[in-house]
Amino acid sequence: MKYDIIGDIHGCLQEFQNLTEKLGYNWSSGLPIHPDQRKLAFVGDITDRGPHSLRMIEIVWELVIHKKVAYYAPGNHCNKLYRFFLGRNVTIAHGLETTVAEYEALPSHKQNMIKEKFITLYEQSPLYHVLDEKRLLVCHAGIRQDYIGRQDKKVQTFVLYGDITGEKHADGSPVRRDWAKEYKGTTWIVYGHTPVKEPRFVNHTVNIDTGAVFGGKLTGLRYPEMETVSVPSSLPFVPEKFRPIS
């Protein structure tokens, strides 16, 4: 099986459509379908900050749950939206406010439909996907080699947030260790979460979050070809959101 793994979309629907078309997908049915049966995989954070979060929920639900032609691994923004939909006490900030504003503008019956779809998508998706006979792993923020095969709370924190130290930068963002430099496995780990200006290949890992919602690019990785394909963002460039190249 061949896959096209898509970086953090964050509600950037037009960029997602442009990227999938560039990757050879046809939208004539209203969904991106590849003529050669390639499958999409999402590294999570499909909502928040961008303009079309609810439409992205509908599309990913259709592909993953209804048609079963794609894979989705939830990100930290997905986890927070899930908790919001469950009625938990979450802070509506850091991008969630845009998704909530879209949601609250809907009539109640459409709100219920979106809520049910997202809860189903989240609950029926694993923390990470191991594909191609363990040659490929798709997750949101990365994973340590010794965590592969586990699904416990420690692994959940890692795949959603990265290798956080518990410390904070001056801007309040968490300090993260560079786990990819320590990764020695042969399984390719494809992930996002931390925006980089260009796809970052380190050992057998690839970060494909190229900051679409911050004016960078939306990137996909073609597997097993290991080729990256990107389209430019239509949003303003916010340079301080990108990790320095190292």
From Swiss-Prot:
Xref: CDD domains: MPP_Prp_like
Catalytic activity, EC: 3.6.1.17
Record field: catalytic activity: P(1),P(4)-bis(5'-guanosyl) tetraphosphate + H2O = GMP + GTP + 2 H(+)
Pfam families: Metallophos
Keyword terms: GTP-binding, Hydrolase, Nickel, Nucleotide-binding
Top-tier EC class: hydrolase
GO CC annotations, alphabetized: cytoplasm
GO molecular function: bis(5'-nucleosyl)-tetraphosphatase (asymmetrical) activity; GTP binding; nickel cation binding; phosphatase activity
Cofactor(s) it depends on: Ni(2+)
UniProt keyword Flavoprotein present: no
Family: Belongs to the PrpE family.
HAMAP family in the record: PrpE
Biological role stated in the UniProt entry: Asymmetrically hydrolyzes Ap4p to yield AMP and ATP.
Protein name (database record): Bis(5'-nucleosyl)-tetraphosphatase PrpE [asymmetrical]
Source organism of this protein record: Bacillus thuringiensis subsp. konkukian (strain 97-27)
